[in-house]
Amino acid sequence: MGKYNLILSEYLSFIYNSQSAVQIPIYYSSNSELENRCIEFHSKCLENSKNGLSLRKLFVEYNDVIENATLLSILSYSYDKYNAVERKLVKYAKGKPLEADLTVNELDYENNKMTSELFPTAEEYTDSLMDPAILTSLSSNLNAVMFWLEKHENDVAEKLKVYKRRLDLFTIVASTINKYGVPRHNAKYRYEYDVMKDKPYYLVTWANSSIEMLMSVFSHDDYLIAKELIVLSYSNRSTLAKLVSSPMSILVALVDINGTFITNEELELEFSNKYVRAIVPDQTFDELNQMLDNMRKAGLVDIPKMIQDWLVDRSIEKFPLMAKIYSWSFHVGFRKQKMLDAALDQLKTEYTENVDDEMYREYTMLIRDEVVKMLEEPVKHDDHLLRDSELAGLLSMSSASNGESRQLKFGRKTIFSTKKNMHVMDDMANERYTPGIIPPVNVDKPIPLGRRDVPGRRTRIIFILPYEYFIAQHAVVEKMLIYAKHTREYAEFYSQSNQLLSYGDVTRFLSNNTMVLYTDVSQWDSSQHNTQPFRKGIIMGLDILANMTNDAKVLQTLNLYKQTQINLMDSYVQIPDGNVIKKIQYGAVASGEKQTKAANSIANLALIKTVLSRISNKHSFATKIIRVDGDDNYAVLQFNTEVTKQMIQDVSNDVRETYARMNAKVKALVSTVGIEIAKRYIAGGKIFFRAGINLLNNEKRGQSTQWDQAAILYSNYIVNRLRGFETDREFILTKIMQMTSVAITGSLRLFPSERVLTTNSTFKVFDSEDFIIEYGTTVDEVYIQRAFMSLSSQKSGIADEIAASSTFKNYVTRLSEQLLFSKNNIVSRGIALTEKAKLNSYAPISLEKRRAQISALLTMLQKPVTFKSSKITINDILRDIKPFFTVSDAHLPIQYQKFMPTLPDNVQYIIQCIGSRTYQIEDDGSKSAISRLISKYSVYKPSIEELYKVISLHENEIQLYLISLGIPKIDADTYVGSKIYSRDKYRILESYVYNLLSINYGCYQLFDFNSPDLEKLIRIPFKGKIPAVTFILHLYAKLEVINYAIKNGSWISLFCNYPKSEMIKLWKKMWNITSLRSPYTNANFFQE
């Protein structure tokens, strides 16, 4: 068994090191004789420990268990009251504690003052500005670091250097914390006033960030960066990350391209050996030096020096150090401001009348025309989605907050809740549901606010609008997104593309006569000037569209949408400031509407077009591409002559001057070789991503459990690692141990083993080998998976009570009746289940389910239930396949250049051998004919699981299913009677399997699964025509080959001789695969 169990056992002896501590390992086996020995062994261990006897004899007597059974969990047992952290910490607190400089930050509360100075009384205190928002504590983090340090104090050679670097940094952290004492957390992992009052306010979040940074130190460079960030972030809680990452926007413009990848006509990446010189005017260097100066003024020394040194030869080879600095800067933690300051930030902008009206008009018209272009077709054809927009909105209503808490009655149960879905049900039950009236958000009913915190940027506010806004906008926005999906300009939405495609798009046209203009418009989006022209453009577009139809329902939809825009032009927000709630007129665009992303992209595109049309008066160029991606836009301009410093200087100044005429405070840059936007940056013809996901601090608290957060932590670690920021894996595993342990009583704790946490069951948290998703096929693995599946999903009394109430039932019935033309149990049950699942975001319900889950888990970890679940998982399928494959050694040459320098070596190697993919594999069934047929006539969107169920029904049942959703009988008949139907069966099965195998997550999303180089390693003689079977055999083989290569850095080839008789059996099995949701799949999904 793996490294995890070994570390677990060492960790337990490190934590519970007193005489009274006992560790009892619990084993299980699928072999019934051995299983009985496991049970005996366990009960004797308990017996002995109760009587204070040693367990050593038992370990000898039951050697067969230890050798042959599988470790299930470790029960640990200690009467020691847990003040061990303080004791251990003293050993490391040998340095000088940090002293915060209390004048660094502009806002008083952002200075790291004593808590009692910022909040004189407990009533005034709030932890919202420093809450780590993660279900693990500072003391656990300290323990994890000290465990690592103790374990490695005897390392030698290079490893000793790493130890010394980390020890040195930890001394700073330990000394500072030791000066004030370790803050103790409460049961909810929050830090209360009496704990914090005599300590610096930001101590906890700073210490978490510092630990995260020091455990990511390997090289000397890492050490210098980390040391500087740890020391300075103790005082500077506001601008440090921004200062350190600012230079990147210029650095990308300084590296020559010598060979790069470009997108070809087939949308694949293709190597191009072009050479493009970086042309940099002096003004750019002045700006860069100014940035470096600002860094030095803030007390940074080593980081600006590294950048300065790199500037000497500006080589792409040494650029990864710049990328590293850029990534590290985010790990100083989130900047959390008071809501008032976050809102006032946008309102501080000086409003001038001195703007170019002509440009504003052009901007508004472009928005208008784009809105019309997006919605023209659906409006002219009276699209059913626009007719049934209200139903569509209700079906996809979220369970987020509706902005106010209300008392709701469900049957005999009365609850208080803020959730949108519950408010809708309650309003319907009480005749208050009026989707045709969009409530005002003016001074009488100001908008409550949410917040979005990001490292290195100011806190942004989010509107929490009444659900009527969502219903009014949903259908129209969906139509806009469908348009954006096949429009290349919208990089974020473009059909199944990924970031690599966008990378090839930029490099495609770069040459000695082109320049690329890139702008960060996040400031513009939330500026006051944007609001009138922005909303007016949309309104004008809607007015034009209204003249294109006579359908009353479509007109109503457009009208309600228009009303949301009108209302939002006069918006007020409510901000709690101490005990008072301030109402402020807010004239800017904030997130929170359904249209936020789509509308921002439209406005962005309009903005860059407006600017380009202005500067084309002065310069003659052809616009090769325009792209908008979130808050950023970029364009490649081609000139008739070679680009010179002077030209760049002129274009750059003209662009800035043009933006200034609209009073748009944006960062606009021009370069010949690279760009930097929020999502990715291109330098020297290579693509980089910012590895800036915080591990030990979270943005906000949600209702995820400790297990969920452990999986999210692991998932974040993986994403960072792929992007070039590596945290020590042993440390991550130690955090997983801490976060997945279950307390039974004060002195009893249960720690699950690696097998439990890595088998793909409903409890999976991480992979035993980074980047490789294993599907266990050994008897013990399948046995434990079956056992976990027998733990049916947990019920909740509150949820059942709500679901039984007439309020809930009537709501679900109402949805079904509006949607269905005849009885359809699959859909009705689906709606009821979805609605019931939405209740999970109501805390009491999720708590109830969590408790039930934990008690079931506790039983399970002490003795697995023998239960033969009849469900088939993907593991069963792979287990059937495995025996028929024979392995032999193979060789694949490296044939592609590197284009993503931050990748770990083993992943890089695979891309260099088989190539990368620029598209997402379709894994939701949306491309199938049946899915398209349904969306042609109905607003209902079946999930991949539902399609998978439906497509395997009898033909007449499929017909009934379709007819009930309003598909005309003739179309349903044609579908079932045609070849398309059998093609669909295969296609949906394919999507479903891809979905189960997480093919679009982790590092698998980077590999070209259809690579001819990969195909030639796999030989499967063609027997009988069952494409589904051929597909699964090939896919299994590809995963095996790739996983082997990730692990060993070499290739194997597979030969499969699959008997014809088995094929039909396998094919039947493939229609009964159960999908498993786990914290692990959740975390993947959570990544995007």
Curated annotation (Swiss-Prot):
It is found in: Virion. GO terms for cellular component: virion component. GO terms for biological process: DNA-templated transcription; viral genome replication. Residues 501-687 form the RdRp catalytic domain. Its cofactor is Mg(2+). Its main location: virion. Gene3D superfamilies: 1.10.357.80, 1.20.120.1390, 3.30.230.140, 3.30.70.2480, Viral RNA-directed RNA polymerase, 4-helical domain. Keywords: Magnesium, Nucleotide-binding, Nucleotidyltransferase, RNA-binding, RNA-directed RNA polymerase, Transferase, Viral RNA replication, Virion. It is an enzyme of class 2 (transferase). It catalyses: RNA(n) + a ribonucleoside 5'-triphosphate = RNA(n+1) + diphosphate. PROSITE patterns: RDRP_DSRNA_REO. Its EC number is 2.7.7.48. GO terms for molecular function: nucleotide binding; RNA binding; RNA-directed RNA polymerase activity. Interacts with VP3 (Potential). Interacts with VP2; this interaction activates VP1. Interacts with NSP5; this interaction is probably necessary for the formation of functional virus factories. Interacts with NSP2; this interaction is weak. RNA-directed RNA polymerase that is involved in both transcription and genome replication. Together with VP3 capping enzyme, forms an enzyme complex positioned near the channels situated at each of the five-fold vertices of the core. Following infection, the outermost layer of the virus is lost, leaving a double-layered particle (DLP) made up of the core and VP6 shell. VP1 then catalyzes the transcription of fully conservative plus-strand genomic RNAs that are extruded through the DLP's channels into the cytoplasm where they function as mRNAs for translation of viral proteins. Belongs to the reoviridae RNA-directed RNA polymerase family. This is RNA-directed RNA polymerase.
